[in-house]
Every structure is written in C-alpha cells, then in structure tokens.
Regions:
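Short gly/ser-rich loop at a beta-strand->alpha-helix junction or flexible surface loop bordering the NTP-binding
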Residues: 1-184, 189, 293-307
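Surface segments flanking catalytic/ligand-binding clefts of nucleic-acid enzymes
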Residues: 157-307
Length: 307
C-alpha cells in the first residue's frame, strides 16, 4: 500500500492535503498519487481512497459528511426504505457547497434540485466522512416516519442472547444518552424500540399489530430452547421468513423441525414472507384476526404438559 493510501485509510478513507503533508508527502507527490489513481480528489484539498463507498465520496464532495438514513447502512443499521435523496450533514455556517457528482458546480443551499437533503448542524456532525451512530439516529428521528426510525433503532439496539459474539451497536448507556437528545414525543417513540428484533419485517409486523391492539411480544423463549419471532397472546407464533435468521444456512430444516415440535406441544404457528409484511399487510391482518376470533391465540384444552 502506498503512503498516500495509508494516510487515507488512517482517516476512514478520506484525508486532507494537511494530513498528507504531515505524513511527509510533497505537493508533487500528492499530485502523482492522484495521477496514479491511488487517491481521488473530491474537493480542493480533500482526497479519498478510490475504494471508499460512492455515497461517502458524494457527501464529502458536497462539503459535509454522509448523514441520516444515507449513513445508516454503513453503521450496520437496517433500513425500511432506501433514501430517494443523499443525506449530508454540513456545518451551520458552511458556504460554497458543491454538487455531489461535480466538484466544480456549486450547490444551491436547499440542495433539493440536486437530489441532496442537507442537515445543517453545528460542527457538521463530528469527525470523519460520516456522522456518528448517535448523530445518525438523532437525524433520522427528525427526518423520517416513525416506523422507519424504529427499524433502524431496533437494529442498533439488537442484542441476541444466543449469539453473544454479535456486538450490540447501541448499548443501554448509549441509548440513554440518545434519549436525552430527543424531544418528549421522540423519546416516547424511542421507548417502543426493543433489543430483540432481528429483521425489518419483525419490527414492521410488531408495530402494525400493536397499533391495532393485538397483544404481541417479540423474540419470546419457548419450550425446547426455541424462540418465537412474534408471539400473539399466549400461543400463536408468527414468523417472518425470507429475512434475518430464517435465511441462514440450514435454516429451512431447522425451521421445519422447530415448527413440528411446537405444534406437537400445542402451539399454533403461522408464517409469512418479508415481502408480504411490507406489501400485503391487509392479508396478514385478516388471517391474524380470524385466528384470534377462533381463540387460537390463548390456551384451552390443547394446553400441553410442556407448558
């Protein structure tokens, strides 16, 4: 790896001319690195490793940091809907912003005509080419519908008891700090997030059921060491397939074995695809309500000795 690329890597893929000269590179050496495509010039005095994600390059070219829902996936968050605009955090006093695809074109302060959504922030959202995880979430609260926010926040807080090797992106202390930055209404929304959701479909289904008064819990432990994606009432298991753990190698056979065991000890089980949850919720809602009218969600004579 060349010295120029090493400097870029040490700065999260994006560095300044000052970073490069501090490492001993002359102006001529910097120009040669650009010529050899070891570096890509984004703005005057700002360079990137060519392998940096395109959205980061665009945000830096604008004059800020990748922000909000545009930064969410790079932080490891789940996104309900892909953004139609490039979200960029810029300093409240920033001037001479540039077009995301052309460093020579000025950007109108609204940004909308160029497909950019500007987040004016004192300090521009921190250091590095994208805002911090906490700043990303704060921006999402003020910018996106509540369901979109919960999908991302569930992902940030996800803590899988049977997968301790998977790090929790936003631990309890960080969540408490996040709450302090939110308005009362947004704090109320944040408290609806959970640590057990493992997929967008689970979050969406949980919230849509909750909104209609259906008694639902997520990631509930079951007999035999199994878990329910969602448990309606006492015994109706609702699984969302095609996303999350249901797509892992061997998941099909494991899911069939699990379904057989749980049926044998008295649980009722229905499963729907991720696509159905997002695009055909009315059908799912109809099935759930018919089952609840039949009292399938509560224990009766089928209560098993495994309970």
């Amino acid at each position: 790896m060349s010295e120029a690329r090493r400097v870029a890597h040490a700065n999260a893929g994006v560095c300044t001319a000052a970073d490069l000269t501090a490492a001993g590179l002359t102006r001529r050496a910097i120009a040669a690195a650009v010529e050899r495509r070891e570096l890509e010039r984004l703005r005057r005095g700002v360079f990137a490793d060519p392998g940096v994600p395109p959205m980061i390059k665009q945000a830096v070219r604008v004059g800020g940091r990748l922000a909000c829902v545009s930064a969410a996936r790079l932080h490891g968050l789940r996104v309900l809907r892909e953004p139609a605009e490039l979200h960029v955090s810029v300093d409240a006093h920033a001037t001479r912003l540039r077009h995301p695809d052309d460093r020579l074109r000025l950007l109108h302060p609204s940004g909308t005509s160029s497909g950019v959504r500007l987040h004016w922030t004192r300090g521009g959202g921190g250091r590095g080419p994208l805002v911090s995880l906490e700043e990303c979430l704060v921006q999402m609260f003020s910018c996106l519908p509540g369901l979109d926010v919960l999908c991302a926040l569930d992902a940030a807080r996800e803590r899988v008891d049977w997968m301790p090797e998977r790090p929790q992106l936003l631990d309890d202390a960080a969540f408490a700090r996040l709450l302090q930055r939110l308005s009362p209404a947004f704090r109320q929304l944040a408290h609806r997030s959970i640590t057990g959701s493992q997929a967008v479909g689970e979050t969406v289904a949980r919230e849509r059921l909750r909104a209609t008064g259906v008694p639902v819990r997520a990631q509930v432990p079951l007999p035999g060491g199994y878990w329910a994606d969602l448990l309606i009432g006492e015994r109706l298991i609702l699984d969302i397939e095609g996303e999350g753990p249901h797509t892992a190698p061997g998941a099909f056979d494991r899911d069939r074995a699990r379904a057989g065991w749980l049926k044998a000890i008295g649980y009722a089980h229905v499963s729907f695809s991720h696509r159905q949850v997002l695009d055909d919720w009315e059908s799912i809602d109809g099935v759930v309500r018919m089952l609840m009218r039949r009292r399938v969600h509560v224990w009766g004579d089928e209560r098993s000795i495994g309970r």
